[in-house]
Amino acid sequence: MANESNNLGLEITELRLGLPGDIVVSGESISGKKRASPEVEIDLKCEPAKKSQVVGWPPVCSYRRKNSLERTKSSYVKVSVDGAAFLRKIDLEMYKCYQDLASALQILFGCYINFDDTLKESECVPIYEDKDGDWMLAGDVPWEMFLGSCKRLRIMKRSCNRG
């Protein structure tokens, strides 16, 4: 009977352990070893597969949202001067007090600014727009409160506001 099954060509449908496509000659015996013998040298010089980046990853919307949140932490405000055709953006966090800001604006725009209201000798008056949209005189509130509420800074010439 065993001879008859060999002659029928049932080797194709025979179930056996091993990799698909391995041809086992009927005369060979299958060893029960789990690992290859030390005599067999496996020389695989294949490079590991490179990780392909998925198209559209990271999502652009979340990337922009994350970066825009980081930018809002800095306190850049627009500064305009009456009579000047240009605006400048400055970071208020760079300055420690009103006097530091006044000296920087004096260098930037070339007009003498004093945030102290008692001295009337300055040629320019700085005002700012707060979060509510109201225009306030700069220097009237403490510096920390000014940093938190200033959205825009405007420097008005004294000759223009006397009317």
Curated annotation (Swiss-Prot):
Gene Ontology molecular function, alphabetical: DNA-binding transcription factor activity
Subcellular location: Nucleus
Keyword Plastid applies: no
Tissue: Highly expressed in stems and flowers.
Domain PB1 residue range list: 74-160
Keywords: Auxin signaling pathway, Nucleus, Repressor, Transcription, Transcription regulation
GO biological process, one term: auxin-activated signaling pathway
Record's keyword annotation contains Nucleus: yes
PROSITE patterns: PB1
Membrane-spanning ranges: none
Induction context: By auxin.
Short sequence motif EAR-like (transcriptional repression): positions: 15-19
Record's GO cellular component terms: nucleus
InterPro entries cross-referenced by the UniProt entry: AUX/IAA_dom, AUX_IAA, PB1-like
The protein's role, per its UniProt record: Aux/IAA proteins are short-lived transcriptional factors that function as repressors of early auxin response genes at low auxin concentrations. Repression is thought to result from the interaction with auxin response factors (ARFs), proteins that bind to the auxin-responsive promoter element (AuxRE). Formation of heterodimers with ARF proteins may alter their ability to modulate early auxin response genes expression.
Similarity comment: Belongs to the Aux/IAA family.
Domain remark in the UniProt entry: The N-terminal half of the protein contains two conserved domains I and II. Domain I includes a slightly degenerated ERF-associated amphiphilic repression (EAR) motif which seems to be involved in the activity of transcriptional repression. Domain II is required for the correct degradation of the protein through the SCF-mediated ubiquitin-proteasome pathway. Interactions between Aux/IAA proteins and auxin response factors (ARFs) occur through their C-terminal dimerization domains III and IV.
Subunit structure: Homodimers and heterodimers.
Descriptive protein name: Auxin-responsive protein IAA5
Species whose genome carries this gene: Arabidopsis thaliana
